Amino acid sequence: MFQNNPLLAQLKQQLHSQTLRVEGLVKGTEKGFGFLEVDGQKSYFIPPPHMKKVMHGDRVTAAIHTDKEREIAEPETLIEPFLNRFVGRIQKKENDNRLWITPDHPLLKDAIPCRPTNQVTHPFQHGDWAVAEMRHHPLKGSRGFHAEITGYITESDNHYAPWWVTLTRHNLERDAPAMTADCQMNDGDLERIDLTSLDFVTIDSATTEDMDDALHIAKQDDGSLKLSIAIADPTAYIAAGSELDQIAHQRAFTNYLPGFNIPMLPRDLSENLCSLRPNARRPALVCQVSILEDGQLGDDIAFFSTWVESKAKLVYDEVSDWLEKTGTWEPASEAIKTQITLLKEMSDRRNQWRHQNALIFKDRPDYRFILDENGYVLDIVVEQRRTANRIVEEAMITSNLCAAKILRDKLGFGIYNVHMGFEPLQIEQVVELLQENDIDAKTEELLTLDGFCKLRRELDKKPTQFLDSRIRRFQTFAEIKPEPGPHFGLGFDAYATWTSPIRKYSDMINHRLLKAIIQKTDVEQPSEETCLQLAERRRLNRMAERDVGDWLYARFLQPHAGTEQRFTAEIIDITRGGLRVRLADNGAVAFIPAPFLHAVRDELQCSQETGTVIIKGEVAYQLNDIIDVRIDEVRMETRNIVARPTA
């Protein structure tokens, strides 16, 4: 009787048009239900039956219904799926050839039915790691989710799984590129000055093989120091547009992961033909500049193509020990002693000048994983930045400033690192926060390089980093740009790196531009697309380093879970759900859930905005506080470390 009834169809249409519909992001929970977050302001409850049609992270439109005075979201249309390509673990039941894959994500617990493509012939076992692509979604008319396995990664118990899974997840290479037939040294009509008689030295870690910078210094009659920075020249072997150049462009950077690296260039180039090894004649690009007695750079900046020969491979710790008068190491000759002594003087001059005229980053330790041949973590050692590290840092910053100036003045373009300081849209919040802390600041001034530097120096004088940490939330991210621009974070009006061409494609580009200036030839400006590719690769490499690190930290700290072992930790972030802390001894990041801070939720307030935890109206914790914690739990499946404060 109601079939094809026009009145009923009209009523349905009216109800449909009157129903509120919103677009938002699905947020899953571990309990089966979820929420639809709309513009970060409003969230709607998604009951378990409706959650079976969507996945955490899906962007959807949903109809909003009211049930017992509660607004409920019913997802209707998929706008953008959370999962496209993903990695996960194969699930397989005994005596059943069907396969499922569980995505490797903390909030995706359900196994997805899957099958391999015809090209994937590996006989999958339960627990194997694989990469897959989503093919079916319930909101796209399918009965359920379904994925297609596009590749095998490794078996379940492979101790190198953290590396192989992470590299596959981010679509990054696992191996060094191979040498190509067209990779031959070809300078064309470029003339090289022979500087092999000068006592250039390299200073690196003991295990470094890809040495790309060497230093030489001489004292002048007027008291200035003539600093020469020699940088390895892979562009002598790699022509622009060649096969190897395209590979380097794609990789963009050497990928440094805990335990090993995946180079941008073939190892025979990066660790042999181009590496500035001791007593080996190598092509190099040299920057020469005077360091005046007050630390200022002279106006005699010069770049030229050269042959150099490093006279010694020095090691950071040994040079630092000698300068700090500890240990037993001695330089091999008086000439090397002179070089080290003068380089220390150069470093002191430049550091003092930067303190007064630019900005200096606070020293933060590096953490190095010591692994055995099977990928087990034997130890994690803290490597502090020492005197020799600062020598190399000052020399590299000096040479990058010189390159930035020459590229700007001679060409007007190059690959520049640009950082614009505070986000203009948030500058009023910065001013308000500073005024609350008795710092008088003006909006217009804070958006200038000088005003930013003045504020940073004032914050550096504070007894704690609490205000500094809160202010950093309002800063922009550093960008890679094809034109000059200021770098507020360093305190310079322009900054362009060129000192690591073996490891960074951006530095290879700047090498070619500097060579064009030396040879007085025309050259094209780098494209915005190239800069975007460099930035994206840098982001992926950093995520890969973090992911592998998280996995290894979880392995390393698992034996301490549930024990009374104490760790000193710094509070690095405060969210509504609790604290994130960094363990001082090894650099691991752990999470302290809010209930571990105080049992009565109504008496507890965790505020990211103020950077504080308030218990019963009193500030109990704040950013950068140092506290003692113990490891409560290590969740290996999500690589999460859960800690709690010691009583």
Swiss-Prot record:
InterPro entries: CSD, NA-bd_OB-fold, RNase_B_OB_dom, RNase_II, RNase_II/R, RNase_II/R_CS, RNase_II/RNase_R, RNR_Ribonuclease. Its EC number is 3.1.13.1. Belongs to the RNR ribonuclease family. RNase II subfamily. Pfam families: OB_RNB, RNB, S1. Involved in mRNA degradation. Hydrolyzes single-stranded polyribonucleotides processively in the 3' to 5' direction. PANTHER family: EXORIBONUCLEASE 2, RIBONUCLEASE. It catalyses: Exonucleolytic cleavage in the 3'- to 5'-direction to yield nucleoside 5'-phosphates. This is Exoribonuclease 2. Keywords: Cytoplasm, Exonuclease, Hydrolase, Nuclease, RNA-binding. It is found in: Cytoplasm. Residues 564-646 form the S1 motif domain. Residues 192-519 form the RNB domain. Coiled coil: none annotated. GO terms for cellular component: cytosol. It comes from Photorhabdus laumondii subsp. laumondii (strain DSM 15139 / CIP 105565 / TT01) (Photorhabdus luminescens subsp. laumondii).
